[in-house]
Amino acid sequence: MSYLNLRLYQRNTQCLHIRKHRLAGFFVRLFVACAFAAQTPLSSAELYFNPRFLADDPQAVADLSRFENGQELPPGTYRVDIYLNNGYMATRDVTFNTGDSEQGIVPCLTRAQLASMGLNTASVSGMNLLADDACVPLTSMIHDATAHLDVGQQRLNLTIPQAFMSNRARGYIPPELWDPGINAGLLNYNFSGNSVQNRIGGNNHYAYLNLQSGLNIGAWRLRDNTSWSYNSSDRSSGSKNKWQHINTWLERDIIPLRSRLTLGDGYTQGDIFDGINFRGAQLASDDNMLPDSQRGFAPVIHGIARGTAQVTIKQNGYDIYNSTVPPGPFTINDIYAAGNSGDLQVTIKEADGSTQIFTVPYSSVPLLQREGHTRYSITAGEYRSGNAQQEKPRFFQSTLLHGLPAGWTIYGGTQLADRYRAFNFGIGKNMGALGALSVDMTQANSTLPDDSQHDGQSVRFLYNKSLNESGTNIQLVGYRYSTSGYFNFADTTYSRMNGYNIETQDGVIQVKPKFTDYYNLAYNKRGKLQLTVTQQLGRTSTLYLSGSHQTYWGTSNVDEQFQAGLNTAFEDINWTLSYSLTKNAWQKGRDQMLALNVNIPFSHWLRSDSKSQWRHASASYSMSHDLNGRMTNLAGVYGTLLEDNNLSYSVQTGYAGGGDGNSGSTGYATLNYRGGYGNANIGYSHSDDIKQLYYGVSGGVLAHANGVTLGQPLNDTVVLVKAPGAKDAKVENQTGVRTDWRGYAVLPYATEYRENRVALDTNTLADNVDLDNAVANVVPTRGAIVRAEFKARVGIKLLMTLTHNNKPLPFGAMVTSAVSYTHLTLP
């Protein structure tokens, strides 16, 4: 190294600040130079970068003076992840301008953008005087505020003293960022059918179709829910077709009130009074609008099927779920309930016609509210039920819950109708280590169908507790005691004192009533105990218990329901032992079932780096016993196929015998496909006497300004992916969801009032397609159809060698395009 260069670096007292990734190929020479410089007295000279470290020819190196001031990028617009005080805010395009010699480039953030991230603009002197589109000089207006761009991470780190931040809850998203979505129409369809060949009972055919349609205009959402059922039998003449209208409603959010307005068919909250369906109007709080840090249950249903069975779930007289399940234990955790409360009646219909029927209580956890938070509901309309034995009286209901200091909550409500008056008052308390408890009492005055008048009270206790030390989670302990004169509002809507909840027909009733349809107001409810507990056993085992016990006045008959199970794992081998018991008050005997399931993935025997398709397959064994001598054993394989693992299969075979049925071989095979245009399934099961073929298709149709897009079944809130030109691109973290031939896709669900990340997998793009950005973030309101737009560039990729005067471009040169649609990428 020359003496001149050495003297230059003796002047450069800041050489240690040169970023190592800029000069990675020359670190040896830099180390020597800095070592010599360390022996020389420090000076205050400005940073100087000697281009001879990069090339002997100075013309081979561009002007790098901007890097001498720590400016790693030229001014421009860059897409960055924004973090404020180490918390993620958003990913967006930010314009960076030239700052002073020490700052390099600085972000241009407007007052509204900073306010959306939680800055209290009123607390910063002079900030509210800036124009709406002006760049806020953040670091000069707020002492100790910083803004630093991490080029390598594409991350903009902002720090602002807490004194200048708004007092917002964690996870708060300003309402101005909520997206009400686009105007569009939607249709959900779910069709299922099965054909049963019974050597003794003949042939039977069943079909079920559920249609959920809707229309979004601005913030308004119109929805309709209708079902159709069909059945025919060789032993009866003709077939039976039945259309059933479930509900229609119009709703929208009222953002200033953090509430929701519903017109038409709806349901009351089941937190204070029993939930009921109505036709009328309701204004109620919507806690989904609150951030997660300020928020305080559809139940999970467990059951056991003896064979391939049809599971139907009813709530408030309506069929809300219908599916075919394989033999053995099953879990249903995706119920779309027709109401926010109301016990669920679960029917398991076996292929031989036998049924298991039990009721799953559906109620809320203790009603505690945060200090200062108020939740309310006001409803006016007429009572609505799918039971033909019930009338439609008009009623008014209001409820109110308010959080007080020290963990207390007070709540109450009223129900008013011509033949019914009820008033409720209760208190709740967060008792810290002792759990949470709520107690309330309802005073009711009722007039029954025989015009008899009754006064009564009902007292309810609810308790919730988690014992983290022992791994015990007491999810819900509830007890309700009612005096003999207490009736709820639904009891007064019956036209007779007793009967069956079935549809009336002209002439002789052809349907044989079931004991679960029977009601008798002379035997009103007395006491009800319900319990749900989960217990962690070690690191890999979980025990769960759930049950309820309902007694009645005037009879010793009781309703009983109990579920227990043990889930455990040894390495990657899982097994489950489960037990169920159900009994209706008017049923003789009990239905019981004991089951064992073992699952062993084939990856247990494969190398960790194996790419065999068997990595996505497992072997299984199941045994079920009804404790009356009937036992079924099944063994087989199940797994997934295709690149996206969106084709699942299961093949099982075994033996069933003992008890009341015949003995012989049994088994089933199923295929389920989840695709970009919808879902489909088909299955076949057999035993010695019965053969069954079942099938189904489901999906969603979205009609919008850009055309019609097909997809998987749509949830209440969905995302329309718009990426014209990017056909057949996979949507990340979604099974089977890809863009269609036009570049559109439907993300079938999204979380309302929360930021949802939508991303396209760039590895699935065509060779001639690029995306400016593969990630979009949306914050939909409830029921919205929001658009996530991606700009696709379709063209031909070129690899070019650029020269100037027949020489390579200087190191660090900037290359720009005079044509806006040309996209240049330089290494």
Question: What role is predicted for each listed range?
Answer:
Residues 235, 266-275, 440-525, 578-596, ...:
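Outer-membrane beta-barrel translocator/channel fold
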Residues 203-209, 242-246, 297, 392-396, ...:
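Residues that define the transmembrane beta-barrel architecture of outer-membrane proteins
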Residues 2-4, 36, 42-295, 627-702:
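Post-signal-peptide, soluble extracytosolic/periplasmic N-terminal scaffold domains
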Residues 74-96, 725-735, 805-819:
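Short, ordered, surface-exposed loop/turn motifs in non-cytosolic proteins
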Residues 67-70, 83-84, 173-177, 299-308, ...:
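Structural motif
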Residues 822-826:
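Conserved small/polar residues in nucleotide/adenosyl-binding loops
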Residues 162, 181-199, 220-232, 261-265, ...:
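Transmembrane beta-strand segments that form the barrel wall of outer-membrane beta-barrel proteins
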Residues 189, 211-215, 247-252, 398-402, ...:
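Residues on the lipid-exposed face of transmembrane beta-strands in outer-membrane beta-barrel proteins
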